[in-house]
Amino acid sequence: MIVHWPGKHKQGYVCDTPVVSTDFYPTILEMVGLPTRPKQHPDGVSLTSLIQGGKFIERDGIYWHFPHYSNHGMQSPGGAIRVGDWKLLEYFENGTVQLFNLKKDLGEQHDLSLREPEKAAQLLSQLRDWRKRVGANMMPPNPAWQR
């Protein structure tokens, strides 16, 4: 993410904190002096303090939810969670998961779900709890679809 905000941050400042597009809305609201609207961006947090070189607000994870077929990189409906260096992918069609340590495997080439079953179960539980908390819609079955 590249930010130009004259007089508000040091030129050339680089930060390696993960952010997600849902953070843009509360960030822009705060940048222009408007109040944030948490009901409109329940997962987004303002990045203004981060942009200005301060501490980032801690969050319990970054979540993705794609309950449909798309070209977003996932081949089938699924969800994902990132917490620290760990990322878990859940595939809704067959109930499988993949687990990656992004610090050691940024390209997500080595699935650790069988080697780290406790971590996979913890993240899967956290992902499913988040879906319930935000009322995430799941894809309804299509009775007309045939394999």
Q: Which ranges hold each PLM region?
A:
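Active-site-proximal N-terminal segment of extracellular/periplasmic enzymes that hydrolyze or transfer
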Residues: 110-118
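Charge-dense polyanion-binding interfaces
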Residues: 122-140
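Short glycine- and hydrophobic/aromatic-rich loop-to-beta-strand nucleating segment
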Residues: 1-3
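Hydrophobic packing residues in well-ordered alpha-helices of helical domains and bundles
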Residues: 81, 120-123
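Generic structural marker for isolated residues within well-ordered, non-membrane alpha-helices
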Residues: 25, 109, 127
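Intrinsically disordered, low-complexity polar regions and short flexible loop motifs
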Residues: 105
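C-terminal cap/loop subdomain of S1 sulfatases and analogous C-terminal strand-loop tails that border
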Residues: 8-10, 17, 22-102, 133-139, ...
